[in-house]
Amino acid sequence: MNSFDKTSDFIDQVIHRLYEKNRHDRIFSKDAAHSSTTSSVLFLLGMHCQETDFSNLPCLILNKRSLKVKQPGDLCCPGGSISSRVDAFLSKLLYLPGSPLTRWPYWQLWHKQRRTEARDLALLFATCLREGFEEMCLNPLGLKFLGPLPQQQLIMFQKVIYPMVCWINRQKRFSPNWEVEKVVYIPFQDLLNPSLYARYRLNIKTSKDNENHPDIRDYPCFIQHSKHSTEILWGATFRITMVFLEIVFGFTPPDIKSLPVLSGSLDENYLTGNG
């Protein structure tokens, strides 16, 4: 992170690396805009590490899911499924001058040379902007769009996630709704530290049938320590984060077989949100 002493250098590096990654690849599947399995999320970056001592370094900003939703306690990016009518209307507003999308340096190129994908990009970006506002009162006009990340497939749910990388310019306070327990800030300085990764060994108790035959699975994870709590980043959000770190910094986490074991469990409430 020492090579990014200036915020502008960090942002420019992210924009450039994402564009180079995406310039020759198709980002969205052909039915992405119409599939019920499609979700889009905001991969939020900013300088607001309020719970750490690294307030002047770039951070990843995530939501911690509340006990009232599926996957309670997990760290996630704000976002969700497409609301056809609402998001179609909002996507048209993103074509207006001064929007986060039209301020993106490569928008005009996409709009001219990749028109279908540009339309899908606008729709999916509108979706996660709306969800970000609903979940944490994120100001969509205060974001700088840096580019899309490759899609991710959820393992336990039939969902395809399209992450949109954004920089939060000025907003420092958020107001989470009932879906969100709190906002979590992870400095990239920590994410680039191999010693903070572990092997998350989960005992998955999704029914009484497997009590005598436990379903034990290992997942790579990142452990975030703060003054008030310890958070575990794993699953789809972990994979999205690792893709970002590899594209932008050339960083890959240690092999899972070499990592210390951290034990945990999931019960049937994990899939229903009835905790």
Predicted features along the sequence, with ranges:
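Amphipathic alpha-helical interface segments
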Residues: 183
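N-terminal leader/linker segments that precede catalytic domains of diphosphate-processing enzymes
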Residues: 1-180, 188-275
